[in-house]
Swiss-Prot record:
GO cellular component: cytoplasm
Positions annotated as active site in the UniProt record: 22 (proton donor), 157 (nucleophile)
Cofactor remark: Binds 1 Mn(2+) ion per subunit.
Top-level taxonomy: Bacteria, Bacillati, Chloroflexota, Chloroflexia, Chloroflexales
Binding site for Mn(2+): 136
Gene: psuG
Name used for this protein in its record: Pseudouridine-5'-phosphate glycosidase
UniProt KW keywords: Glycosidase, Hydrolase, Lyase, Manganese, Metal-binding
Swiss-Prot/TrEMBL catalytic activity: D-ribose 5-phosphate + uracil = psi-UMP + H2O
Subunit-structure text: Homotrimer.
Any one of the GO BP annotations: nucleobase catabolic process
Function, in words: Catalyzes the reversible cleavage of pseudouridine 5'-phosphate (PsiMP) to ribose 5-phosphate and uracil. Functions biologically in the cleavage direction, as part of a pseudouridine degradation pathway.
Family: Belongs to the pseudouridine-5'-phosphate glycosidase family.
Length: 305
């Protein structure tokens, strides 16, 4: 059922480093042609660090591990025709022969099915603010608890309830590791006031943590690991400014009655307006940084064997 690119298959068979990349950024994150340029740039970051990129998505109902250039462009220009797929949506998309962009949860599931251990993304989903009333909790969190993939990110998206998200990850038994930081990043800013469970000083330390977790998965964490990389300092936003912008964005969402899956894209778009586009620049910068770190960690994992 999976179609795995020949380059990816060869790398996996030879024990070389492969990094999975999601595709929702392409179809739902940025306008064309910026989305395509960023996607191609992320793949270039992986290659520059010595690993093989595997951007994941569905093309005409077929899960593809390693989209080619034409397929990347197909998702980039597809607009509303391209479905946003979490794990629960994959089956229906296959039946309907639909094109689909994969979220963190879906990308993790497909990466694991293909034998890929490392995945780079911007920020994971989490517990939404007001979840005590809405019960809006991202499937990314439960996926991390059950699927053995090391996810490299800049924490959870800042629009979320970060303390509750960390509590949920603890409940799921997911190690939250800071990359050269003791503080859980808040996506746009390195500062959240929240601490991580462990710290990796470099890519080799992160790789060793992951190898030990997988070796002893019967009594250590059986699922994924979150490696949290602060956004690059020169692109990071001030914590106070971020919180103020989020407050205004949340008020707009409430006033307009935005609910369900529409909440996150609405809030991210509102954040871009509230910050005069700075949040988009930060998002792209942290994506590139996370991807580079993920590739370096993947190379170290392959060297450990």
């Amino acid at each position: 059922m999976l179609r795995i690119a020949e380059e990816v298959t060869t790398a996996l068979e030879e024990g070389r480093a492969v990094v999975a990349l999601e595709s929702t950024l392409i179809s739902h994150g940025l306008p064309y042609p910026h989305n395509l340029a960023v996607a191609e740039g992320l793949e270039a970051e992986v290659r520059a660090a010595g690993a093989v990129p595997a951007t994941i998505g569905l093309i005409e109902g077929v899960p593809v591990i390693g989209l080619n250039g034409n397929e990347l462009e197909r998702l980039a220009v597809g607009g509303d025709r391209v479905r946003k797929l979490s794990r629960r949506d994959i089956g229906a998309a296959i039946v309907d022969h639909a094109d689909g962009a994969t979220t963190v949860a879906a990308t993790m599931a497909l990466a694991a099915a293909a034998g890929i251990e490392v995945f780079a993304t911007g920020g994971i989903g989490g517990v939404h603010r007001g979840a005590t009333h809405s019960w809006d909790v991202s499937a990314d969190l439960t996926e991390l608890g059950r699927t053995p993939v090391l996810v490299v990110c800049a924490g959870a998206k800042a629009i979320l309830d970060l303390p509750a998200t960390l509590e949920y990850l603890e409940t799921q038994g997911v190690p939250v590791v800071g990359y050269q930081t003791v503080e859980f990043p808040a996506f746009y800013t390195p500062h959240s006031g929240l601490t991580v469970a462990a710290v990796a000083a470099d890519a080799l330390a992160a790789a060793r943590m992951w190898r030990i977790q997988r070796r002893y998965h019967t009594f250590a964490a059986p699922g994924g690991m979150l490696l949290c990389v602060p956004p690059p300092e020169r692109h990071a936003l001030e914590r106070e400014a971020v919180e103020a912008a989020i407050g205004r964005a949340l008020a707009r969402a409430e006033a307009e009655g935005v609910r369900g899956p529409a909440v996150t894209p609405f809030l991210l778009a509102a954040m871009a307006e509230e910050t005069s586009g700075e949040s988009i620049e930060t998002n792209i910068a942290l994506l590139r940084n996370n991807t580079r770190v993920a590739a370096e960690v993947a190379v170290r994992i392959s060297e450990l064997g």
